Amino acid sequence: MNKKGYLTSTQNLSFESSKLLNEIDWFGFKQDNNEQDPVKKFKTKTDKLIHSDFVVADLNNLTTETAMELGIIYGIAYSKAVMDEMFSNTDYELQNQIKFLAKKHGLKDRDIYCLNSNKETLNKYVEGGLTCLDTFFANSMGEIEKECVNDLEYLNLISKYTSIEENMYILSDDEEEETWQLTIED
């Protein structure tokens, strides 16, 4: 099954890597949601965003739409961190069932890549939120492509050595490193 990718609301992003084009189904690359009804457009794009494994955003041309998309991603990561903490002391089988259901509904980790050729002009609040999400910042699409290909190859490699019953469990990885900045304080 191909991974899913999401390009934020910009027309300036494109890939040259055939690996990225063949192994990731991108929303926003060759097609866009031309729906005129604002609610339908929001729901369609948000559904694609929620179920994506990879998100690429152009911060050089930051729009309110891109800011909203990145805010949704942060909200999902925060919700996942809360859920992970709530169920951290349950048995292994229950944890895997909960992770499966969470992933099915978009509560999962995703790789985020941001094109930003001038980090000094980026709003510090936005930069802080993206840093909490372990975002990869790049000066060019070439850098993003290289990092994305490496991440994709890593995911393909670990999936070969991990047995997963698709209908029951999801990959149980160590997510502490990725979500430590989102840990809920007492």
Could you describe each region identified by the protein language model?
Residues M1-D186:
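Conserved catalytic or regulatory cores that recognize and/or transform ribose-phosphate-containing ligands
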